[in-house]
Amino acid sequence: MKRKAEKQQATAPVSAFAARKARQQQAQLVEPEKTAQNEPAVEPPSKRARWSPEEGAARQAANGNDRVQTRRSTRRKAETLSSELAEKQPQRSAAAARAQIAERTPAPEKGDAETSDAAEEEEEDILERENGVGVIAAEDDAEGYESPADDVPQVQNFPLSKTRLNKSNIVFSDERTLCVRIKEKMTLVLLGHYDLWVKRGVISLMGAKLHPSPRLYRVYAPSTHSLPVIKCVAGVDGEAEIEVKSCNSGIYRLRHLSPLYQRIWNGKNTAADKLTLKKASASTKRTFSVLYTSSDDSWNRHLRPLHLEKQWSSAIRSLSQRGGRLKVLICGPKASGKSTFSRYLLNHLLSPAPQTENNHRNTDGVAFLDLDPGQPEFSPMGQVYLAHLRSPFFGPPFTHPSLAESQDGSIIRSHHIGVTSPKEDPDHYVLAAMDLMDRYRALLASYPQCPLIINYPGWIFGLGLEVATWLVKSLGLSDVVYMSEKGPAEVVEPLGHAAQEARVPLTTLPSQPTDFVSRSSAQLRSMQVQSYFHMSHPSEIHNPQWLDTTMSRSRPLVVDYAGPRQGIRGIMVMGSQISPDLLHEALDGALVGVVAVESPNAIMGQADTAGFSGSSQRDATQGAEDLSGAASDVDMNDVTDASHGDVAPTSSSSVESMITRTPNEDLPYLFVGSGSCNPLDPKASNCLGLALVRSIDVPSRKLELITPIPGSKLRDALEQGHGIVLVRGMLDNPSWAISEDYYAARAAEKHHQELVAKARKETDTRDGRDAAGDADTQGMVSALLRDRIRRASNVPWMTVIEDNSRRHREAAQREKSLWKLRKKAYPGSESETDW
C-alpha cells in the first residue's frame, strides 16, 4: 500500500498547493508508525546527511506544526510560513537542544561535587572540595571543538584496570588501608595520592620494578596526567601482594588557593571503594579510589592509564643494560613524550633488581641533567640544573618541584635562565649546559657508576637544532634518543650526521600522543611554581608537606638592599635595558632568581677570580645579619674576613663597579651590556632558587621576599663569601599569588556554609534559645567572611566578575575550552587510542 501511495503521489498535480497537501497527508500516515517504532524516518534515505536525534525531533515538531494549517482563506500565506518554518525550525530546534544539553551537562557534576564535599568535610578534610570558581569540568568537553560527538562515549568509558576486586583477592581493608593480591600480567589503577607497600612479588610502576621491602613509596596520581598503572610482573604462586594506604601530604589543600588544583584528585567513592568499605561509615573516604574504567569517576573526567609502547619498553631495557656507562640525550618535538620517557628511564635505573642480569647494582644513583627551562622536572620554571637522584619518583613535576632537604635526591648545581624557552639567549643556555656537564664529570669522581640522563627541550628546529647537534658532538654521549618516527627529515638527518660523527648510536622512537590534556603548558607551570612556594620538607618525615597559607600571610625574608647591612649585592633585569626609574615597578610583585655570585667578575666574558674579598666580603658578612623571618637561622657573625684572604678585585670589571643606584628608591641596579643586559657567567654563579618580591620598603631600604629556599642554603652561600644577586627574568607573571586570598576567602565561606547546614540538621535536639544564639553567631561569621571576600576581590591587577548570566557563562565556557588540547594517534602507533 505504501508503494502504491508513493506512485500516486508522483502522478499528482505539480502545483505548489497540491504538492504541499500531499506531503501533509503523507506525514499524517507516517506519524503513527514513527511513534510506534520510535524511528527517525520510514522513507528510504535521501542524499542529504543523516539527521541527529535532536534534528529528527525538531523535524517531527515542525511537521506537527504544519498540520494545524486549516483555514483555506489564508492557505497561501500559511503555505509560505509553513515552508519557511519547515526549513528553519529543524536548525533552530537542534541548536536549542544542543544548548540545553550544554547547560544541563555540568549540573549533576556540580551536585555530586557539593554532596561529596559536604560528607568529606564532616569526617576528615582530605579530599576535593569545590570553592565555586574552578576550571571547566571534563564533561563540558562533550561540545566538541575538534572531536566528533560520537567519540564522547568512548572517551568517558575507557578501560583502566584489568583486576576486579572481590573476596578472593582482597586480603583486608579498613578506612585508610587496602591490601590486595594482583595476578601476574594483571593491572590495577588508582586515582589520588597514596603510599604503596610491596609485600610479595614484583610490580612495575612508572618504569620502576619494585621488589618486596619495608619501604613505602609515595605515589601521586592526579587527573591532570595519565594515571600510573600498577602491574604484577612476577609473583609468589602467580600473585603479588601490595598494601595501599591513605596519606596526608597536604597537597590537596592547594585547591583552596587555586582553581587549577580543584577536581584533580579522587571524587566520590567508586563501586570498588564501596566494596572495600562495607564495614565503615557511609561518609568514610580514602585519599585514593580504585577505578575499573573511566566511567567509574564521579566527575566524568577524561582519565587514561599510563601505558608504554612496546618500542619504548625495549629501548628502556636496552639503555639500562649500559649501567654506569650510560650518557643519553633525549630530544624530540614538543609533546612527543620526552619527559615521560625520561621519567620512565630514570625510575628504571633507580630501581633495578637486587641482582641484575649484567651484575650491576645501582648504588651511585642517577644524574639527571634537565635542559628544559619551560617544563623542568625537579625545579621551578626558568632553570636548568644537574640533579643527583637516589630513589624513584612517582608523580608529575608539580608533586616534586624542589629537591631541597630531600632524602631522595639533591640539586648539584642550577642556573637561572629567566625564560621558558632557551631561544631567547642561546649563548647563555649553551654555556650553562656545558658548566653543568663539567659538574657531572666532577661528580663521577665520587660516584663512578652514576649514569646520566639529559632531557632536551622541544626546541628542535632552526637554531635549536644547531644547539642539539653541537651538544651531541661535544658532551661525549653514549646514546641519543629522538622521540618521533615521522621526522621531519630536516631534523633527523642533521641529528643523525652529528651522532655518526660522534660515533654515538641514534635511536628513533615513536612519539606517544595524548588524546586529552586538561591543563595547558602555562597552567602546569603555574601549578608547579605555586606548589614550589607552598611545599616544605620537615626533617622529621621522609615525604614533603604542603601548606595552604596564602603568600600574603606567609612570613617574609626581610633583607636590606642598601646601607651598612646590605644583603643584596645587586638587582639584574634580563632582556632589554630599562630605565632605572622603572626598576621599582619591574621588581615589585615579580618572580626573581636568587643567584649566588661566586666571583666579582661574574659578568659574561670577564676573567674569573678566587672570590669576593675585601669590602665586598665584609659587606656580605654584615648583610647576612639582617636576614630574618623564614630564614632567620642565617647568621654571619662567625665569618671573618680572613677566611678567604684579601684578594683585591679589579675595580673596573667587578660587579660592584657596575651597579647604578636608582634615584628615588636607591635600589642597586646591575646592568652590563649594550641594549640588553649580559647575563651572569654560569662558571661563576649558581642559582639557589626563586623568590617572590612581596614589597619594597623604600624608607627603610628593605625588601620583603617570599622564598622556600632553606636558610641553611643561604647561610652556606654567605659563609663562602658569595654575593646575592636578584635576577628578574621574563617568566610568567605570578597571577596565582595575587588571587590566592580571594580563593581562600571563597573556600572559607563555603566551609562555613557547610558547617551551618550541618548545624541546622541538629537544631531539633536543642531548645530555641540555643538555636537563636547559634544563628546570631553564624550570621556574624557569615558577614565577616563576605567582607573578607570583598576585600580580597579589590586587590590590584585582578578583576572579579560576579556576572552569572547565561551570556557570561557561555563566554567563559568558550574561553576555558581554548586550552583543551587534543592530539590524535596516528595509525600503527600502538598507542592507547589506536584501537
Curated annotation (Swiss-Prot):
Residues 1-132, 608-658, 758-777 are annotated as: Disordered. The keyword Kinase applies. One of its GO terms (biological process) is cleavage in ITS2 between 5.8S rRNA and LSU-rRNA of tricistronic rRNA transcript (SSU-rRNA, 5.8S rRNA, LSU-rRNA). ATP binds at G332, P333, K334, A335, S336, G337, K338, S339. InterPro entries: Clp1/Grc3, CLP1_P, P-loop_NTPase. Polynucleotide 5'-kinase involved in rRNA processing. This is Polynucleotide 5'-hydroxyl-kinase grc3. The gene is grc3.
